[in-house]
Regions:
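Bacterial N-terminal signal peptides that target proteins for export
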Residues: 1-8
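Bacterial N-terminal signal peptides
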Residues: 8-16
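Sec/Tat signal peptide C-region and signal peptidase I cleavage site
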Residues: 18-22
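Intrinsically disordered, low-complexity segments enriched in small/polar residues
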Residues: 23-114, 125-127, 131-182
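Short, well-ordered beta-strand segments enriched in hydrophobic/aromatic residues
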Residues: 114-120
Length: 182
């Protein structure tokens, strides 16, 4: 009888610990994966380059993707209904829903222009908004990214250098339109 009582107490304690642990884990906000401090070198005109130093920066934070020249990584989307509710960093591009490549190709406008390539590996079209900082300009620019078709790739070009590009407001779109499906 005493053994049954001890066994019951042990089971109750284990369950209480498991529930407490699960509540603690779900209550903790997700900490973004950070890239180490780095120096970015960008070509700003035909003959000149500039360096920009950044402290630790997230790859993804609060459903926004932070890109710098030379980046190539993926994200996963959590979709509920027809809405993107979460964007998370995925370093393994083979497991990512979207893969981003951001670069300053030498062959574009004397190496000054920027190119963003997006590979969409999900079964829905995706669109997003961009905001970026241009060296020497005080204000950030805003842009809409053309919808990337399901299972396809798309490339966006800008004729100027971009020190940092932030992508946000990820939306699923219906065929032939950039507005979210309701």
């Amino acid at each position: 009888m005493r053994n049954i009582h001890l066994f019951t107490v042990a089971v109750v304690l284990c369950l209480a610990t498991a529930v407490s642990s699960a509540q603690t884990k779900s209550a903790k906000p997700k900490t973004p994966v950070m890239r180490e401090a780095f120096t970015l070198r960008l070509k700003v005109d035909k003959d000149h380059s500039e360096e920009f130093h950044y402290d630790k920066q997230p790859y993804v934070s609060e459903n926004e993707v932070y890109l710098f020249s030379g980046d190539k990584f993926g994200v996963n989307l959590v979709v509920k209904g027809d809405r993107v509710v979460e964007v998370s960093y995925q370093p393994n591009v083979s497991k990512a829903d979207l893969v981003f490549g951001f670069e300053q190709p030498k062959e574009l406008q004397n190496g000054v222009a920027m190119a963003l390539t997006i590979d969409n590996k999900i079964k829905r079209d995706v669109t997003m908004e961009a905001m970026g900082s241009i060296p020497g300009k005080k204000d950030a620019f805003k842009d809409n990214i053309a919808p990337v078709k399901a299972g396809k790739s798309s490339t966006e070009f800008w004729p100027h250098p971009i020190a940092q590009l932030v992508l946000g407001n990820f939306r699923l779109t219906t065929e032939g339109t950039a507005s979210p499906k309701k």
